[in-house]
Structures are given as structure tokens and as C-alpha cells.
């Protein structure tokens, strides 16, 4: 088997949130034809129990504990040396020593980096083909954060956006290939760095459509007689927190005023204090961790994705579409998804439009045409098999000179 070094900023298992879904499917696919040497961080104590599962797919492995609080403090060193804070956040000398050992002792033919913060570990490598999966343009996400933050965080976020964009460009120039999660994201990066356009491509996230299938039987987790709106996601993630807080405060009251029996369920692990506080609002339920999100999707009346901060492709939207649910999404949540608006995916432009569309769909009953079309779109365009074939082609190319 050909040997490959794979560096990931977060352990690629379990595949229960956006980045881990993509990094896991990459690992699983790569392991079919490569001996994969994996270096990664673990930033959730609950994930240590999965290391044997991950090891079963790998050759050599290195798992490094990352305490988010301590890493944030350590990242401030970037302020003193003019670096994006992302780099010291993900810097670890033990991981660097392991990378050096693997590259010095194993016949590694390809290096795959998942997310920009991990590229620093192979910045001096020249004799091995290097590919980076940026996934999203993270620098733009930091700029989005800055628009809703007060001082001094808005200054820090703008600084991070500017410096990280410079680093993203540096990586794209130096590496042999770069990938993103959608054609939209790749095209935006083409505009930011035209000279590297020939090296930049994309492969879509996929959905396991057999797992997320409306044909399966699921227990109903909701009380009888209620109309349910549901949002799913990791509820300590800033973009998700912003989305549900905005929806709960700016959209949901208008819906409840018209339809008092409607309830809004926020489903996902580790709800932040701001999210947990929403449970005090009439008609809002915060579940915390659930072992299986599919029953919550299957029995919901509508799925909402009101993200105001977003890049790339939202897996939560694709999963709901695969379950034949009507998804009402913000423009940011819908960006990058190849779906016909109003026929496969419904887009709401602002809080008034969101409330109007939710009320209209709930009052007018079933729309099986939209539901079926949504799943067909996922089946046609969002399978892992189709997307990951592009990575195979990149790995088989000769190293750029």
C-alpha cells in the first residue's frame, strides 16, 4: 500500500459534526488504498474512547490532548509575533516531532492536511506531494464574526481574518493542490488568489442517504399534538449559537403569536449558556446531546437553518433534505448547496420572511413535491463516493515542480 500522512485539527471520529463528518469520510476512504499515518488533536475528553476505532483505520498515529481554554491563552502569543492566532492555537512540539519521525522513517508519498492550522507542520517539506483541504475559507468566517462582536473582540477577529487570509494564500501557493467543500467556496478563493486557480478545486460533502432515510422507522420524540420546528447542530459552535438565539428572539415570537401550539426544538450537544437560557422562552425546548438526531428530523414539521454566519456547505441542511424534510434556510446556510430554490430548498431573506414562510408552510399542510425533490437532489449531487473520487485523482498526480 502507498503511504500517506494525514494531519487533522480534531480527531475524525465520531462523525457527528460538520468538520468531523468530512474528515472521517476522508480517512475511511483513504484507508482503502493507503497506509494512513494520522496526527490529530483531541479537544473533547469524551472523544478519547474512540481512539481504538480510529487506529483500526491507520498505520502510525499520534493523538494530542488539546485543552481549548489553555490553547486560547497560548494563541495570544500570535499577537506578539504577527501571526494569525490559529497557528499557535494548533501548535504542539510533540506533534511536530512525530511528523518529523514519520517523514524520516516511512516512505510517505503524499501529505493531506485538513484545515489551514495544520499546514505549519509540513511547511518545510519539499520532496513530497502536499494537498490541503481548506474545507472553508476560514478567514472569511472570522470577518463575519467581527461584524457582530464588540470591542476588543471585533478588532481581534478582523486581525485574524486579515492574517489568516494571508496564510491561506501562502499555503495555496506552496502546496501542490488545494480543495474546498463547494464550487462556490473554490470560486471565491480563485478571486482572492487568481494565480493559484489552476491548483484549486472542490469536492462536495456527502450524506449517507441509507442512514438518513425517510423509509426507516423512528420513534417520535415530541409531545402529541404539537407542530415542531427543529434546528440541529453542535450547540457550542458560535455560528449555531448565533443562529438559534437570533431565531428565538427575532423570528419565533411572531410565529407563536399566529400559531400558539408551535414549538421550537434545539437539538445538539453541549448547549452554551446562551442556548440553555432559551429554554425559559415559551415553546422552546433545548435537548442537549441526543444519541440519534434522525427521529427529531423525521417527526418535525419543518427544519430551520437560520445561520447568519456560515461558510461552505451545511451538513445539517443536506441531512434534513435526505430525510425528505422541508428546510427553510437563510441565504448563508443555503450558499454552496446546488438546490433549486423554492422547489428543493426554501430560502428566507430576513426575520419577517422567515416567520412568514414558516407560518405559510404550517398552515398550508404537506408539500410532498418539495420533500421528494430535496432527497433526489441529495442522491444526485451529494454522495461521498462521487466527491472523494476527486481526491483520488489529486493523489495520483505527480508532484508539481
Question: What are these regions, as identified by a protein language model?
Answer:
Residues 176, 283, 295-312, 323-326:
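Acidic donor-binding loop of glycosyltransferase active sites
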Residues 345-352, 360-365:
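Conserved acidic donor-binding segment of nucleotide-sugar-dependent glycosyltransferases
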Residues 63, 131-132, 139, 157-191, ...:
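Donor nucleotide-sugar binding/catalytic pocket of nucleotide-sugar-dependent glycosyltransferases
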Residues 173, 191, 197-299:
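Conserved catalytic-core segment of nucleotide-activated headgroup transferases in glycan assembly
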Residues 316-319, 326-330:
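Short hydrophobic beta-strand element within catalytic cores of glycosyltransferases
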Residues 9, 68-89, 130-169, 187, ...:
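Acceptor-binding helix/loop patch of EC 2.4 sugar-transfer enzymes
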Residues 366-381:
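A short, well-ordered alpha-helix in the C-terminal region of glycosyltransferases
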Residues 1-63, 104-106:
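N-terminal subdomain of nucleotide-sugar transferases
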